[in-house]
Amino acid sequence: MKLCMFSPMDRDLERGWPGRIEGDRVIQLAAQTLQSFFTGGGSAREHDEFALADVDLRAPVLQPPSIRDFYAFEQHVRTARASRGLDVPQEWYEIPVFYFSNPAAVYGPEEAVPYPAATKELDYELELAAVVGGDGEIAGFTVMNDWSARDLQRLEMKVGLGPSKGKDFATSLGPVVVTVDEFDGSSGAMVARVNGEERSRGDVGDMHHTWRAIRDHAARNTRLLPGDILGSGTVGTGCILELGDGRWLQPGDVVELEIEGVGVLRNTVGQPA
């Protein structure tokens, strides 16, 4: 099942409605959000249908309770650390580490993401993200862009803490959440394009840590909430930092992240905030 948040183009809705996509139609769900739908707070209203061409898709979870972004692809870890003269620590193989990102800075498909102030090295990061359901288990998957300001991040992390301002200005999610009965997050081609040019390619199956390990580590000594986001981390070659060509994003660039079985998340880089 493909779930979404959507707004009919002829209506001005602040948050949108939850829906289920079937072919070229969207069926509205009798719930306020996908989080409430996951907890059993809604069902399909068969009479509230819209043509997919007549709606705008929104971020499937507009303000998640939390965003944990993991570090699950060995190629990305190895290349990123090698650029700083570092090896992959043994502990990386033992635990699926993560950092917390900013739930208040989530963007949906087709939205312009403001170019952050004080950076000259804006980067995309190609990731798969799990969305937690009402039972604390993974309910489905979406595409995630963990936007990064590399020069800010580089400065901050010299202190031994972070990332902070190098990351918390934007995370994009979308275009849909595909439930685990249709997509289990074990494989699928991952591609990033900038202005139509392919820049990155990898596969979900290259993850070192499993989704079970990621979910269980996230839940240890705490409680996962409906709508929590668990990012996979960047696939190998899935960011400009890793490519090493210095072709950083500029205002007006169109970034498309595509994951086989999930969809295409497209955003335009906006003007400086």
For each predicted feature, which ranges?
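A conserved acidic, glycine/proline-rich C-terminal tail/linker
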Residues: 210-249
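Charged, cofactor-coupling segments
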Residues: 1, 5-24, 156, 165-178, ...
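Generic structural signal for buried aliphatic residues
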Residues: 128, 230-231, 255
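N-terminal non-catalytic cap/leader segment that marks the start of a structured domain
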Residues: 1-96, 254-258, 273
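Residue-level structural signal for beta-strand termini and adjacent loop
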Residues: 32, 204-205, 270
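Glycine-enriched loop-and-adjacent helix/strand subsegments that border the catalytic/binding cleft
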Residues: 61-215, 221
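Extended hydrophobic-aromatic, low-complexity segments
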Residues: 200-203, 228, 266-268
